[in-house]
Amino acid sequence: MVRHGRTTANAAGVLAGRLPNIHLDDAGIAQAVTVGRSLRSVPVTHLVASPLTRTVETAKLLAAELDRPVPLTKDKGVVECDYGDWSGKKLKRLSNEPLWSIVQSHPSSVTFPNGESMSGAQQRAVSSIRRWVQVAGKESGPNAIVVVVSHADVIK
C-alpha cells in the first residue's frame, strides 16, 4: 500500500476527501518518483489506484520508475473515505468540531456528517484489496506483487 504524494490540499491544510482535481504539488511529485525508484527492483505485477486525480498521478509517476511496464487499474474500492460535509474544509476549522476528538481517538466509530463511516471505508478497501490479491494470484501466480495507491485513512 502506498499513500499518494503530497497535494496542494495537504499543503493548504484542507481535507480533500473525494473532491476532484486535487493535484500533487512539487513535493508530492518528488515523493512519488522516490517511491517508484525504491520499488524498481521489486517485480510488481499489478498496479491499482483509487480513481482520484492525486492517486492516479502518484501511480503513473511510480510506474514510470519501475524496471518494466505495469498496467494501471483504477478501483473505486480503494477511493478515499467520503467525508461528506467535512470535504474541502480547513483542518483547523474541523478541529473545533465536537466529532474531531472522536475522529482522533476512535476513528472506527465515526460516521462523517452526510458521508461515510470509517469502518465502512475500511471494509470496502479490505474487500477490494483481497479481490486484487486473488486476481493477481490467478494471473501471475504465487509470486504476484500488487501495489495499491490509496489514501491515508484508507491505509490506516
Locations of the language-model features?
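Active-site-proximal alpha-helix that buttresses catalytic centers in soluble enzyme cores
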Residues: 2-3, 8-69
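Cofactor-binding loop segments of dinucleotide-utilizing enzymes, especially the Rossmann-like FAD-
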Residues: 4, 77, 151
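Short, active-site-adjacent cap segments at secondary-structure transitions
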Residues: 8, 54-56, 80-81, 154-156
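Phosphate-handling substructures
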Residues: 9, 23, 65-127
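Generic structural signal for well-ordered alpha-helical scaffold segments
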Residues: 33-40, 122, 126-137
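Short glycine-rich phosphate-binding loop at a beta-alpha junction
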Residues: 44-51, 73-74, 139-149
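Hydrophobic/basic alpha-helical segments enriched in Actinobacteria
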Residues: 46, 99, 119, 136-139
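Active-site-adjacent alpha-helix immediately C-terminal to a catalytic or transition-state-stabilizing loop
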Residues: 56, 127-156
